[in-house]
């Protein structure tokens, strides 16, 4: 979920000044534009506005199928849930009338909401400034983010039916045909079926095992406890103070209801062995704040088998093997092993 940012200073158009006045007081004197759009169907512009008094505020101008008033209000409420636990998250604002303006902007019909300008830098900015190494630093905050997330899980928030961007067995937005896990698995199957014929029996065996596991998981998954999460813990969203301490998160546009175990497993990804250790570490941290139910313990291994063995990185590994028969066999054998192995997660949840 890394963002491709395009940042530049921009002249303040009179229309933007008028839009700003719908949310805030003060006279805008400068603006910084950050473009985090992802193609024609997901337009996102952030304007950081500075007033003549030196105050900074944020306008978000968005056109996609998952940003609409009801969802923004849900983000707004979830921000307050995080703040209630002592974590810093910039507040999200309606306009002065209590709504969210819809405007024509860059040839698109866009909704607009506002945010408090963050008093803390994201980890990615501190790394870019040469203060530390981003990848290493993200690992340094592992306990912080899973302590925080477990506390949110323990609240069992139920104020929304909108799923998070990590949702399983349902879709995040109308343009999604299937959930991301199934999308990745189908992409794996498509490529695996193009392998030389001598591998196709194993490919079919893997697919049958994966499909049977997913179908069995589906029935029990709907009964697992849920809460509401920010759902995007990459370094661009982790807020760090000047002393290097973790303070909170921002960017709630993937926020929503989710099963905590799904969220935890989806946020921890690497090669098989490292990935399992990351999940176990996160579970160990989480259980200090969250009591895993017997249903969650029983679902942990089937959930892992559903999410991880056919993740998009496994397609990449197969493609990297090219025409090397030994390399292909190695990839398939590892997938089949981790799809069927009796991996212990329960002892890390007790």
Language model feature labels by segment:
Residues 42-51, 58, 211-261:
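Active-site acidic catalytic loop and adjacent metal/ATP-binding pocket
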Residues 154-164, 217-222, 291-295:
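Surface-exposed helix-capping loop/turn segments at secondary-structure junctions
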Residues 311-350:
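ATP/Mg2+ or Mg2+-diphosphate-binding catalytic cores
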Residues 165-217:
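Active-site catalytic-loop/activation-segment of kinase and kinase-like phosphoryl-transfer enzymes
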Residues 1-97, 241-242, 350:
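Conserved NTP-binding catalytic cores of kinases and kinase-like/nucleotidyltransferase enzymes
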Residues 55-160:
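ATP-binding pocket architecture of kinase catalytic cores
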Residues 257-293, 305-325:
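Active-site activation/catalytic loop segments of kinase-like enzymes and analogous catalytic loops
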Residues 156-160, 185, 189-195, 217, ...:
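Secondary-structure edge/capping motif, primarily at the C-terminal ends of alpha-helices
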